[in-house]
């Protein structure tokens, strides 16, 4: 595996390649990331991964400086997995050599709801860096995880509207044996919090069961699920059932027509904020 730190080095290694598959990450890799890279290898060759902690997507009170930088360990994991040909690990000056005054702004009806409501500017930062990375790598395929469901939708829509020649492929959420979605932030959980953490996924499973059984008062079942988590010590930001196609609130006619739905949640357990989702 080649490790490169500049855009020019990256392009030199990829010259003449037209089936590149790409997985962007912020590092601190776990089995979920490695699963994305394995899927990327099925869709193209060579596989490029990136590790870049993107300041633009962190709010003023978020954990940019605290976010784990584990490049040496990440390189060892990637070399052991043997799925990645080039790792692109730029520093901030390489990605942002001047102030990033031009940015991608997702539409309000998608970028300012759910995660966007609680993390203003987050999806603008994500969209901007993904567009820059796609410009650097120029892949045929890019792989994203469904754990970040709203992010996946925004990236797909951005690529479609800008007519970028890249297919966005989604990987199912990778979970621990007890159902907890794998996340770099899980390392912040205390042992007691780690034991409690699967309750978030269980709340989503309960919503799925109730909708499958015919529940139609979605605000009521969302409220009950959030209250149940709060009673266990969670601080719930949102727990919502939305349409898969646009993440808008389902209307009665959507429920009657069998519109595909997804339940999404974000909640804090202690100081750690976890997100998850489940297609219904």
Swiss-Prot record:
The keyword Flavoprotein does not apply. GO terms for biological process: pantothenate biosynthetic process. Beta-alanine binds at residue 57. (R)-pantoate binds at residues 57, 151. Coiled coil: none annotated. It is found in: Cytoplasm. It catalyses: (R)-pantoate + beta-alanine + ATP = (R)-pantothenate + AMP + diphosphate + H(+). Gene3D superfamilies: HUPs, Pantoate-beta-alanine ligase, C-terminal domain. The active site is at residue 33. GO terms for molecular function: ATP binding; pantoate-beta-alanine ligase activity. Keywords: ATP-binding, Cytoplasm, Ligase, Nucleotide-binding, Pantothenate biosynthesis. It comes from the Bacteria. SUPFAM superfamilies: Nucleotidylyl transferase (SSF52374). InterPro entries: Cyt_trans-like, Pantoate_ligase, Pantoate_ligase_C, Rossmann-like_a/b/a_fold. Pathway: Cofactor biosynthesis; (R)-pantothenate biosynthesis; (R)-pantothenate from (R)-pantoate and beta-alanine: step 1/1. It holds the Pfam family Pantoate_ligase. Its main location: cytoplasm. HAMAP family: PanC (MF_00158). Belongs to the pantothenate synthetase family. Homodimer. Catalyzes the condensation of pantoate with beta-alanine in an ATP-dependent reaction via a pantoyl-adenylate intermediate. This is Pantothenate synthetase. It comes from Bordetella petrii (strain ATCC BAA-461 / DSM 12804 / CCUG 43448).
